[in-house]
């Protein structure tokens, strides 16, 4: 099952049960687009929704979460999971928060996983998205744990930048060439710095000798 239908939303209304939804995959797979869509559906269903994005990701906007295709959603720009917690506590004093969205969860500190669990246990729906693996094809922090704990996991694929086949890997490009193994892990520059690649076209990063 990849997403929730109206019956499950109604069950939430009556039982006040929280859960975790994880949207993951490689670069350019449409994760943010799907993330925004789900939060909008719940907002239309009269749920109070708050969205958060990491301060490191300011490619398109500081105030909005924006997908590569241009879809946007109002959000808080935050530096840590503790800041997320503080904002939620403050907003709950105004009106109870029903849904929390966290964009690019792999860029947050590792305490964010514990916070997400706490929120779900409090009856809040938590929807997060993030890369499942880095450009070396190693598991990304936070997402690796959420793959285990989330009630709902959607793994999206892109199309290979080179051959057009299904892609589930992110190739980091530096100066027109695949990045070396020791290249910095985090580089948020969109399509100019990354390409979606399939298994056949992906080039395993080389280690400097």
Swiss-Prot record:
- What keywords would UniProt list here? ATP-binding, Cytoplasm, DNA synthesis, Kinase, Metal-binding, Nucleotide-binding, Transferase, Zinc
* InterPro entries documented for this protein: P-loop_NTPase, Thymidine_kinase, Thymidine_kinase_CS
Gene giving rise to this polypeptide: tdk
Q: How is the quaternary structure described? A: Homotetramer.
Q: Which PANTHER family match?
A: THYMIDINE KINASE, THYMIDINE KINASE, CYTOSOLIC
Catalytic residues at: 104 (proton acceptor)
Q: Per its UniProt entry, what is the enzyme's top EC class, as one word?
A: transferase
Molecular function via GO: ATP binding; thymidine kinase activity; zinc ion binding
HAMAP family referenced in this protein's UniProt entry, alphabetically: Thymidine_kinase
Q: One GO BP annotation here? A: DNA biosynthetic process
Q: Where does ATP bind?
A: 25-32, 103-106
Q: What is this protein called?
A: Thymidine kinase
The UniProt entry, under Pfam families, shows: TK
Q: Which GO terms describe its cellular component?
A: cytosol
Which Gene3D superfamilies does the UniProt entry name for this protein? 3.30.60.20, P-loop containing nucleotide triphosphate hydrolases
Location in the cell reads: Cytoplasm
Q: What is its main location?
A: cytoplasm
Q: Which residues form a coiled coil?
A: none
Where is the signal peptide, in residue numbers? none
What is the originating organism of this protein?
Mycoplasma mycoides subsp. mycoides SC (strain CCUG 32753 / NCTC 10114 / PG1)
Family listed: Belongs to the thymidine kinase family.
List residues binding Zn(2+): 160, 163, 198, 201
Q: What EC designation does it have?
A: 2.7.1.21
